[in-house]
Structure formats: structure tokens, C-alpha cells
Amino acid sequence: MGPELTIQTVHAGDETTLTLVGEIDLLTSTQLNRELEIVLDRVPPPTRLCLDLADVMFMDTTGVAVLLKGRRRALEVDCRFVVSTTSPPIARLFEITGLAGLLTE
């Protein structure tokens, strides 16, 4: 059995929070991409999309690409895209790649 990813989606007013648990990689990134598309295609879309990655322990470049694609799509629909919480490994990944200032609060 390969890595798993669970996503809990909570809509509260005009804000949506995705809480992710597991790993984001080549095998699981399509699941995240699909969920981001569903959330951002809502009418009206949320004004703020918050991702909680506190329980994500691994992310490869595929996962990074999905986050950047989601951020770009969010900007297209006037939605603020933020990663609110990260695990230490993901915080380090964001620091190394320069995404910390772009994606986190």
C-alpha cells in the first residue's frame, strides 16, 4: 500500500479550510488538485482558502506544483490562498524553495 492523503473540507461563511493528513506526492497530488478545483469552482468561490498542512509529513515537487497551481487559480477568482499551518518538514521545504513568504501567513 502506497502513501495516503486524507482531506477534510470545511466551509464556514466565505472561507474554506482544507485540512490535509498524510503525504502529497505523485500518487496523491491528483486528489488534492481535484479538491482545490471543486472548492475554487464553487459559485461564488470562497474569499479565503486556507490549507492546514500540520499533519503532512512529506511533499514532493508534484505537491508543490499543485499548490502553486491552486494559488494561481485562487487569484483568478479573487480568493486569498494561504497555508496556515505546516509540519516541520513542510516548513523546511517551503523555506528551502522560497515558498514560505508566498504561501504562508
What residues fall within each predicted segment?
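Amphipathic alpha-helical interaction surfaces in cytosolic regulatory modules
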Residues: 23-103
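STAS-typified acidic loop motif
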Residues: 4-34
